[in-house]
Amino acid sequence: MPNIIWIPFRETQAVDLITGLGDTIEKQLNQPRDKFTADLKTANDLRNNILNPQPNASYLDHLTKYYAQLTYWTTKFPAGCDSLEFMWYGTLAYTANAAPVISQSLHFERCNLLYNLGSLYSQMGVNEGRQDADGLKMSFNYFQMAAGCFQILIENGLPDLESLNMRGLEYDTICCVRDLMLAQAQECFWQRSLLSGSRNSLVAKLAQQVSLLYDSALAWAQKSPQVRSEWVHHMTCKRQHFLAVAHYRMARDALDGCRYGEEIARLKAALNAIKEGTGKGMLRRYLVESVADDLNGIIDVVTEDLKRAEKDNNLIYLQSVPQTTALAPITPALMVKCTPPVELAKPIEFLTKDKLGLPLFVKLTPFAFHQALVLYSQECDKIVSSIESQLKNCTNSKNQALVEMALPGSLDSVEKPKGIPADIIAHSDQIKSERGLETTREAVKDVQRLAATARQELEAAKAVLDDERSEDEMLRRKNNSGWTRFDSKEAGAHLYTRLAELEQYLADAGASDKLVRGKLDEIDYLLSILNSGRSALENYLPSSVSGVRSPEVKRQVPHLRDLLNNLESLEIKRAQYMDRLSLKQQNDDIEPVLEYHMNKLIREKHANLRLTLADFEPITSKELEKYTVDQDWASEQKELQEEVLEKLDVANKDFRSSLDMNDAAIHRENAIQSLEVAYFSYQEQKDHLDAGRNFYNQLLGEISIFHKNCKQFVYERKMEGASLEHELSSMHLSEHEHSGGHSDTSSTPLAAPRAQRASNLSMWSPEDGIRFG
């Protein structure tokens, strides 16, 4: 069995790309799938070719071609394809194959391909015969390529990977396997230096670097929830082994230089390195036979040399022996780096007929194009909504001012002491035509129903988190200090923060809903009168005796009415302007402009250009400028209305100071004004109810996504917990066997974990040189 590790492939299941990508093209990109029939079939064939991984050149070709095409597709398709589900199984943790991670993301698929490319190169490195310089050189290159694949995954894959799809692809896990590959590449270079007869000081520096790289891989492994304890023990042993080798070679160098005291100190340092962390019997149970043999070999050699050196120094040389802590540090010699194949570093450039094949879906309009269209539409909506809000605020300000001035009630009572004022008739007709009373009551029920549904959905999501937290606390009590993972609120901090936000949204919305219902309750009786028609209005409105008007009143009434008509005229103009603005937005089609710009960019650059949303921003920004004139017009309306309201306030004060009203006239004025106020409030609350429905519908979507994320989080935690329990159980069992009399040192040690067997794995023999430093 080899004394180095290969990374097992992640496994996947078949996916129907013909249907999945075809549906995405039609539903998310709004293009006919028939135009891409041949491309869809080729894409499906490419994925089917990677379903049965093998450590050979043919499978490498399949993986590389699919990876390059997939990289190109991410420039065309959306990040999430609603009609696709990619299913991948991890193969590192104890419960690796228990359940897959599922995602609709092409980027997730691409990350798994990068991982398997790194795995493939690691297996090809192990499969090479490392008994001669050529074989070691090939392994050296393969391990660096494997590290390069994992480095691309770290730099270009993990940052954009969804947090809930990280199981098996955690940052710590990938950093661990990357540094493990670099350590094994450095080990191959060190082995070549032995074969070539390099001087001892150089071999020591190379070995020191091997130890440092294993130490780095070990540090990442101890942070990762995926790396098994067998691998941790393997890397620990390797780290200490090569540290011992480095000191041993420096001891040989000291002997050659007649520094006999330093030789003894170096040999002692070598033995200390082996004893630190590798001397326990339990650790050795987890080592493969070849690694244990390497360890025993270096112990035997160092022990014998130390006996000889101490004897010679005591009898012949009589040199002082320095403390091991006083020895000069061994300068490491780094000879490895992450070197991904150029086809993986720049995959799109290799999509040519004579290399990785021509790119698929070239004629598919990029998703960035559709994003630009959607973003432009959203920006238009924001502008138009802002203008509409400004104009509605004008109307609300007008209504509030009229209420404070008791208009038009006071004027109507003077102009028409009997009967129903024209404004009241108009209000009544509008409310009846809109079924205002029934509509508002139904709207209140709708809002209450939506609010209740939102609360129930959020409570269900909260219950999911509560159950997970209870389970984690139970397992933490059961396993005591062995339960080393983060507690629920730390691990799911983003979810608990989001829960608090959503709860606050519901609380604030509930308070607003209560306020709206209170306003509607206040005007319910008056609304029922307006909704009932003229007979009810005549019964409600008292008549007053028509008296003689003073000259001042006769002069002020038409002036006051003109100002009120001016206000109404401004309101009508605002409504008409909004109708025209809505039509303008409806006919605002910038797709031809964006398409022309996109084609120009492609012609100026190259056919494989990766278009992003930023490429379209200059065009969309320029097109949005056409709404500047509308924004300016809306701002002017507020100023125009304020001028009229100022004049109306002065005229109304003069008018009221000139009135000599009896009780009947006052009662009539109050009745008319109460109906006016009810109408104004009706208009305002109607808008609030519409906004409430829209708010809850949007919030329900957000809560639904949150609930789904909570379930996925709990699933991830269950898998993580099962893995941790399994590891703790295995450790306890091993400790029990070791302390309970099962101490047969000849028993077969545990092998390093592997999910699949690499073919033609070469054996590492003592003649390879590792046992003897």
Swiss-Prot record:
Biased composition (Basic and acidic residues): 726-741
Residue pairs linked by disulfide bridges in the UniProt entry: none
Region ranges (Disordered): 726-758
GO cellular component, one term: endosome
Domain spans labelled BRO1: 3-398
One Pfam assignment: BRO1
UniProt signal peptide: none
Cited InterPro entries: ALIX_V_dom (IPR025304), BRO1_dom (IPR004328), BRO1_sf (IPR038499)
Family: Belongs to the palA/RIM20 family.
Function, in words: Required for the proteolytic cleavage of the transcription factor RIM101 in response to alkaline ambient pH. May act as a scaffold protein that recruits the calpain-like protease RIM13 via VPS32 to its substrate RIM101.
Subunit and partners: Interacts with RIM101 by binding to its two YPX[LI] motifs.
Protein's UniProt name: pH-response regulator protein RIM20
The organism of origin for this protein: Yarrowia lipolytica (strain CLIB 122 / E 150)
Protein encoded by which gene: RIM20
